[in-house]
Every structure is written in C-alpha cells, then in structure tokens.
Amino acid sequence: DCAHQNQQEKTFIDLIITKQIDGMLLLGSRLPFDASIEEQRNLPPMVMANEFAPELELPTVHIDNLTAAFDAVNYLYEQGHKRIGCIAGPEEMPLCHYRLQGYVQALRRCGIMVDPQYIARGDFTFEAGSKAMQQLLDLPQPPTAVFCHSDVMALGALSQAKRQGLKVPEDLSIIGFDNIDLTQFCDPPLTTIAQPRYEIGREAMLLLLDQMQGQHVGSGSRLMDCELIIRGSTRALP
C-alpha cells in the first residue's frame, strides 16, 4: 500500500544519505524511490537484473523476452496449432510487454490474425492463471494451445483445464515461462522457457563490483541466452 511504499522509499533514502549502501542490484523495473536521471548520477552504483527499463539508463542483464516468447509461440505453430491463446502478466511490467510482443509477432509471422479475445491477463499468481484459462475456455472457439507469461500462471491454467475435463496435452497444449523447479514434477511436466537465473545474477553482480571499484560500466543490455525446454504439456495436433 501507499504507506508501506513511502516507508520503503524513506528507508532507502536514509541508507543512501548515511552512506550505508555502496551499490544496488535492482530486481524490478523501477527504482525503490523517485529520482531523475540527473539525480541518479549522485546515487551509489546500480545494476538491473532480469528486468529491462531503458528509461533508467542503467547497466542491465536480462534475456531477450520478445525472442523467447516468439520462439515458444512459433514452436506451437510448428506443432500444428493455429488457435493459440496467451495468458499475459501485468500490463505495466516491461517484460510482459516484450513477451506479449513476441506472441503477437510470432502469430503475424505465421499468418495468423491476432484476436484480442485470445489474450487474457493475470498477476503471475496460480489463481490468476486459473481464472484466465477459464476465460479462454469460455470462448466459442477456445484455443488448442496457450502460452503463459509465467510458470505459476501456467500451473493454474493446467489445473483449471483439468477441472473442466480437458486432457493436457491431448486436448490442450500449455507452455510456461521461467522453468521453476515445480514444472518438472507437475502432471504432465510443463514445457517452459528456462532463464539462466544463476548466470544473470552472477553477471549483474560482477558489473556492480566493477562500478564499485571505480571502473566505467556503460548502460544498456547484456543479453543472456534462454532455452525452450520441451516436456509433456505440449504435443503436435493429430
């Protein structure tokens, strides 16, 4: 809430003023307090990991979310799917914007019209994935495959599809995003996009240490490779 956010901002500012922070590794797409680009120059060194916010002009380590999403949707098309739905994350999150763009660009490249009804949104929770899946299943022509912006929402979608009597992947293919540990053990195991979380964290920390030691580190992206991991939640249409 607003009071909690204000307290958080005050805490960070106090730490900076008292020089208790030598550097900051940001895991979100915004600063924990308001600061202009000019004001940022007086802050401790900062590196952004996993997210991408070009307006902050920070060194950033992340994957190419657009290409990763494109590859996932293109894979579904190659498996014969043409009614491909998308369970997207929050509209205000940059990575969700890029993942949705990847979905849209893949459909267009494959000659499929983008139908807004096939795009549902959630907040990265299991419950949101379940609700979004039901929204897609209620369509006159529901999708035969769904690309989800997160594994947690994909697991919610998988659960809801089963509750509606659908078999995955026989009746519906589902792809997630992140390759969290649980995806290997759900039934069926989830096809997903794996991010190199350790490597992203390591590279971001090395960039931060370079800055803290007085080296110049330019702003902009350092892209890490990701991988589409094929498991049991997707199959080719007969």
Segments from the language model and where they lie:
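Short beta->alpha connector loops
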Residues: 3-6, 27-32, 152
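Bacterial carbohydrate/catabolite-sensing allosteric modules
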Residues: 11-18, 23, 33-35, 41-48, ...
